[in-house]
Regions:
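Iron-sulfur (Fe-S) cluster-binding segments and ferredoxin-like electron-carrier domains
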Residues: 1, 24-43, 303-317, 345-356
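A short, acidic, amphipathic alpha-helical segment used as a generic capping/interface helix at domain edges
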Residues: 311-334, 345
């Protein structure tokens, strides 16, 4: 082992986004991401890591989220969203925090709370939970302790991953909820779906998740007791439990990027598409060899979403950008949907460089735009403050 060999290892293991696309095509069935994970763990034991990974890990262990935000500041951010939502809907919603005896604990990546366009996805969660509380008396609570769904321990070591993951079960047990609902994230769900049960389980103090609104039993979460919000919302829509006005998303011509970990890591392929089709009038798929199990990555996963990696990120994301450009030129697509916080952080930069006419959105931003809330005022804008297409027509008259 020499310094030159260490440098070679470093360059190899920290240019892999752990997207696992290569494993789909490998004739020997080799999962390169698992090799990368072990290689990074060895490097981490030598003290070799990057700040964009190491600092969030330390922050998450210390305060519960990657940014090191204290509980009161986390609540303050959601209070800001409450004000924005009131401006748009005329309703003053009241999110629940750390509520013992709530039905469900909701945990999402902190990127949705602190960075655009994830903030609009976060507002989408809040609007959905308000609707479910008013219509069905469902109590979903946020935690200021387990305030991070993402797990950068996945990019350092299995032991760190286990420590950071443990706070979810600890908080669920403290609050006495029935089960856990998880937000739109990528590697968060690889950890939950493939590692969580053996890392920190069994979670026998929680119930097997059953929707109290539709009665659906979420068999995929029977072991972990944690349900993906896309599966939860798709089930609500399928059972006609949400009143939706698709026309509010007119003007958004949407395509969908299968985030690597929810697609290849857990098979969540149909639910996000179903939600988009039920909330938007215009949806187009990218070429078949660039989506679903064969999806291209954003180029910035596995902790590579840092400014000093910009050239690597833009090159790594070019295949995805090319597929977006294809549907943009063919169908006029102007909105790229996804269910991953790192995607929402990385894809705007990628689109700005390669396909600047296309914006990025989370799926639950689209849900909240379309959701008709009891007692709301007539909506004039979407969650971003952009005029609805119907309002633009009125202005023209």
């Amino acid at each position: 082992m020499t310094i030159d060999v260490l440098k070679e290892w470093w360059y190899y293991f920290f240019q892999c986004t752990e997207c696992r696309r290569c494993s789909v095509f490998c004739p020997y069935g080799i999962d390169t991401a698992e090799i990368t994970i072990m290689g990074r763990e060895l490097l981490n034991l030598l003290g070799l890591n990057i700040d964009w990974i190491a600092t969030p890990v330390a922050n998450c262990y210390r305060t519960g989220n990657h940014l090191g935000i204290q509980p009161h500041a986390f609540k303050d951010m959601l209070d800001f969203f409450v004000e924005d939502i009131e401006d748009i809907t005329g309703l003053a919603i009241e999110p629940s925090f750390n509520k013992k005896g709530a039905d469900i604990l909701f945990i999402t990546p902190s990127g949705d709370v602190f960075a655009d366009p994830g903030t609009y996805t976060c507002m989408g969660y809040m609007i959905l939970f308000h609707y479910l509380k008013v219509k069905y008396n469902l109590e979903v609570t946020w935690s200021t302790y387990a305030s991070e769904g993402g797990n950068f321990g996945f990019f350092t070591s299995h032991e760190t991953m286990k420590r950071l993951n443990s706070k979810m079960y600890a908080e669920a047990k403290r609050l006495g909820v029935k089960w856990i609902l998880g937000g739109e994230c990528g590697h968060m769900w690889r950890v939950i779906h493939q590692y969580m049960d053996t890392l920190n389980g069994p979670a026998d103090f929680l119930e097997t998740p059953v929707s109290p609104i539709t009665g659906t039993r979420f068999e995929n979460a029977a072991s972990t007791k944690m349900v993906h919000i896309a599966e939860f919302t798709a089930d609500l829509i399928k059972h006609n439990k949400l009143e939706l006005d698709k026309s509010r998303n007119d003007g958004k011509i949407v395509t969908f990027h299968d985030s690597c970990n929810p697609s290849r890591g857990m098979g969540l392929l149909e639910e996000p598409r179903y939600i988009i089709k039920e909330t938007c009038n215009q949806f187009y798929e990218m070429p078949s060899n660039t989506i679903r199990e064969q999806t291209f990555c954003c180029g910035s996963g596995a902790g590579l979403n840092a400014g000093e990696n910009m050239e690597l990120r833009l090159a790594g994301g070019l295949p995805r950008a090319n597929a977006v450009k294809y549907v943009h030129e063919k169908h006029g697509v102007n909105m790229l949907g996804c269910i991953c916080a790192i995607d929402r952080a990385a894809l705007p930069t990628l689109m700005e460089y390669w396909v600047p006419e296309v914006d990025v959105t989370g799926v639950h931003e689209l849900v909240a735009n379309a959701l008709v809330l009891p007692g709301e005022k007539e909506r004039e804008t979407d969650l971003r403050g952009d005029p609805l297409k119907s309002m633009e027509g009125d202005d023209a008259e």
